[in-house]
Amino acid sequence: MEIDRKAFRSLSSGLYIISSIDADGRLCGCVVNTLLQVASDPAQLLVSINKQNATADAVSASKRFCASVLSQDTTMDLIGTFGFHSSRDTDKFKDIRFEMQDGLPIIQDASGFIICKLIDTMETATHTIFLGEITAMEAIRPGTPMTYSYYHKVIKGKSPKNAPTYQPQEEADAGSSIRWKCMICGYIYEGDPLPEGFKCPICGVGADMFEKIIT
């Protein structure tokens, strides 16, 4: 039986920004949808992060991480910054509101945060699963948590290439004969030409990072 990877989108999961600090003191962060509470006493959760992400190295180095809970009113600029750029060459925290707590950056535009100390890891072929024990947790502001399904179906967001649920074939349904595809995140703009001053609503890059698709 073939595996229909689109079925992953039917799994109920939220969207989070995992943040940590690397061995050089640099703040790192990335968007994940694979975070799960595994126990309540002691309170523990696990998160899966692609090994190529700088955030995975940071969590391994610092032995701690913060999960900021994203809500449905989270801006696409925030998701694009943390989902489609690398902390190795981008200061993701430069233009966002955050506060430091227990040595970790907390996204102030999130609906809440969970701080964990690392207690164990498990390696897969592409991802490291981090098991953390919760040391602090707080609601920042009211808001409906954003689910992975809401991100895809309502916002029409794409998955970063390092996400466990990334599908290389992700594209918009056939419609216009000319479309423009973002070479960073895969967002599809229907129609031609691109509007003047156009920026990708997902990752924020300009029109120069779009390629024309003729069907």
Task: For the regions a language model picked out, list residue spans one by one.
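Basic, polyanion-binding surface patches
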Residues: 1-177, 181-184, 189
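Short beta-strand-to-coil "C-cap" segments at the C-terminal boundary of structured domains/repeats
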Residues: 152-153, 211-215
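Short linker/helix segments within small regulatory modules
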Residues: 191-199
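The canonical Cys-X-X-Cys-His
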Residues: 203
